[in-house]
């Protein structure tokens, strides 16, 4: 008897700068096949035909998949429309092909799911490994699917729910797709791609944030993979020259001793094989002091200089209560930021605009709270999204009068979406923030990103805050009032407002390239910074800043002039990168005074360094404003020596 052909589909966009041609190996479907293929009943009855990992031409892909008896799709926000189109066309060409779907973006709570998606035969609602094996065995044994828990079955366009499936009790039962050769075929066939890899060291999240579907989809309880397997996978990643690795733990650092060992292994692999070149992870929400040992350890490797992410989401207590999120106490956040500041560790704070209960005033105050707490180098401003299975989408939409719109150029990598556009459902208003107020908040975020977070006025405002008691709210209110009289600033502000309005009205930002850089929802907030480099506007903008500070604040002229010089040298101007590194002597120790409370009037030499290649092209430099934000790209590394 011939074996049934099965293909598994998990396409993604190209990742990062175009020149890397970087793509993720399809881990989610890979781990499914690694699990089921260890059983004789599967090996005897099924043959894996294809793994679809890239958004290739739809008709070519349909032609391949239509030969199969079964096609399974792993569905996320970045591949949903592509997957639906692919599945529909396969079903049209081969009605006997069984179509399985799973993944976080499946509308499993919607009773009309199969009326809208009639080409799908069955949806796996949760963890897929055990359920997929049971389903495949039922097909080969010709037994009923309805006895398998964890499915939505399409019965004459009606959804039959078989209940909740069992969660995997022991993650040791899951073989590695890397170590069992699941990806060997595609890696041998495709040689012009830099592969990205995904590693699960544990599975689950103990939190229930309403904007996120992580905790709900993983049943909250955290289970761990064996360290031996994790280490072997990291070794494989290094040996196979994977350029980037994502550790998918919801809270890396939660298990301090274990995660320290994983960090040690990651460093050892990078040093031995030269790969991976970079990594990403979601750090533990409740960050203990021991977590910093892991961060400092990683950042000593020049490839791993992303620093620490502190995901606060909002700085307002009412908003946090609405989203079922509890942040670290303010004094703990301040200690974290101070520790990172003094040790030159980039620190990165994530906040989300559009959460239930957020107002324009609380949103603005949130930035000032972050600055007062001590984070000045990195704040990532995200727009709230309505994820399919998140509580905010399922239960809170009516309660908080949340409106949203599908935005089709929100994600990076959209330059290779071909004719099938993917969208993100972006929040545009709530009962606490109208659409116009949302626009005002987006403009304020752009203003903070351009001037404080990207470095143009960071040390000026920090110095005035400490020396003269000028609160950040006062400084930036005055700066806004000053700049709003300038034609260049007004033009930039009007343009950014127009592009943000575009996504609320037509679902696309529709921004032209800056140089050769695609502008989308993730990086439009950096638009002005990109233009300043491309159009050589830095001198003009610093002249504006100098006149503003001189007119608004009373400072000793010598101190003021040197403060402005220090500030100007903090920010890297693309047109001046050939002069790095260099040293400048000052009569005032601004860095020591701000960070360590040392005497201000102290002679000191500051060394300003640019830790990237000075041969970097303008396009690559502009790309790194966004892609390098976690390593504080665009700002100098400052060290000092006494005179």
Predicted regions and their residues:
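Conserved C-terminal portion of the radical SAM core fold
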Residues: 70-72, 234-248, 274, 278-282, ...
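Radical SAM [4Fe-4S] cluster-binding motif and immediate context
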Residues: 24, 177-342
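Hydrophobic positions in alpha-helices of CheY-like receiver
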Residues: 36, 89-90, 266, 336, ...
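Short hydrophobic segments within beta-strands
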Residues: 9-12, 74, 102, 248
């Amino acid at each position: 008897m011939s074996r049934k052909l099965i293909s598994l589909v998990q396409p993604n966009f190209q990742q990062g700068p175009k020149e890397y041609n970087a793509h993720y190996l399809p881990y989610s479907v890979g781990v499914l096949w690694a699990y089921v293929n260890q059983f004789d009943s599967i090996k005897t009855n099924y043959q894996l035909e294809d793994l679809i990992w890239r958004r290739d031409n739809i008709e070519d892909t349909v032609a391949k998949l239509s030969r199969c008896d079964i096609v399974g799709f792993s569905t996320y926000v970045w591949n949903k429309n592509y997957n639906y189109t692919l599945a529909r066309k396969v079903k049209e060409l081969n009605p006997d092909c069984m179509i399985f779907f799973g993944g976080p973006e499946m509308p499993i709570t919607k009773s009309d799911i199969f009326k809208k998606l009639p080409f799908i035969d069955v949806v796996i609602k949760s963890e897929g490994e055990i359920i997929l094996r049971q389903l495949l065995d039922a097909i080969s044994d010709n037994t009923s699917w309805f006895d398998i828990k964890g499915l939505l079955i399409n019965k004459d366009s009606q959804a039959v729910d078989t209940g909740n499936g069992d969660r995997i009790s022991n993650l040791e039962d899951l073989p590695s797709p890397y170590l069992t050769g699941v990806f060997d075929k595609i890696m041998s066939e495709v040689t012009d791609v830099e592969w990205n890899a995904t590693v699960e060291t544990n599975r689950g999240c103990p939190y229930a944030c309403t904007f996120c579907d992580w905790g709900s989809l993983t049943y909250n309880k955290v289970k761990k993979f064996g360290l031996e397997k994790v280490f072997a996978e990291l070794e494989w990643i290094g040996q196979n020259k994977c350029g980037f690795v994502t550790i998918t733990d919801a809270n890396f650092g939660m298990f301090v001793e274990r995660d320290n060992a994983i960090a040690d292994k990651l460093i050892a692999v990078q040093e031995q094989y030269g790969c991976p070149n970079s990594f990403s992870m979601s750090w533990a929400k409740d960050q203990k002091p021991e977590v910093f040992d892991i961060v400092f350890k990683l950042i000593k490797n020049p490839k791993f200089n992303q620093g620490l992410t502190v995901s606060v989401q909002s700085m307002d207590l009412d908003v946090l209560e609405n989203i079922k999120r509890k942040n670290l106490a303010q004094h703990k956040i301040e200690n974290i930021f101070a520790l990172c500041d003094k040790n030159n560790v980039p620190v990165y704070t994530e906040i989300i605009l559009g959460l239930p209960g957020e107002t324009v005033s609380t949103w603005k105050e949130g930035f000032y709270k972050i600055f007062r707490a001590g984070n000045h180098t990195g704040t990532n401003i995200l727009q709230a999204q309505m994820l399919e299975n998140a509580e905010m989408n399922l239960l809170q939409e009516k309660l908080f009068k949340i409106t949203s719109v599908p935005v089709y150029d929100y994600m990076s990598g959209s330059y290779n979406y071909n004719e099938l556009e993917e969208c993100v459902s972006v929040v545009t208003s709530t009962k606490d923030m109208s659409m116009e107020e949302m626009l005002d908040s987006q403009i304020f975020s752009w203003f903070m990103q351009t001037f404080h977070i990207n470095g143009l006025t960071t040390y000026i405002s920090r110095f005035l805050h400490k020396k003269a008691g000028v609160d950040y709210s006062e400084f930036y209110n005055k700066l806004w009032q000053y700049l709003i009289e300038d034609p260049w600033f007004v033009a930039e502000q009007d343009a950014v407002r127009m592009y943000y309005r575009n996504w609320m009205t037509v679902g696309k930002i529709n921004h032209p390239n800056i140089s050769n850089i695609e502008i989308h929802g993730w990086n439009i907030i950096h638009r002005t910074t990109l233009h300043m480099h491309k159009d050589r506007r830095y001198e003009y903008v610093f002249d504006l800043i100098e006149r503003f500070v001189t007119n608004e604040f009373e400072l000793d002229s010598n101190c003021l002039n040197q403060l402005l010089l220090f500030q100007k040298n903090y920010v890297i101007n693309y047109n001046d990168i050939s002069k790095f590194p260099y040293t400048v002597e000052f009569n005032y120790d601004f860095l020591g005074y701000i960070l360590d409370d040392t005497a201000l009037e102290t002679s000191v030499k500051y060394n300003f360094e640019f830790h990237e290649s000075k041969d970097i092209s303008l396009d690559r430099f502009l790309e790194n404003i966004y892609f390098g934000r976690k390593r504080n790209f665009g700002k100098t590394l400052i060290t000092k020596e006494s005179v």
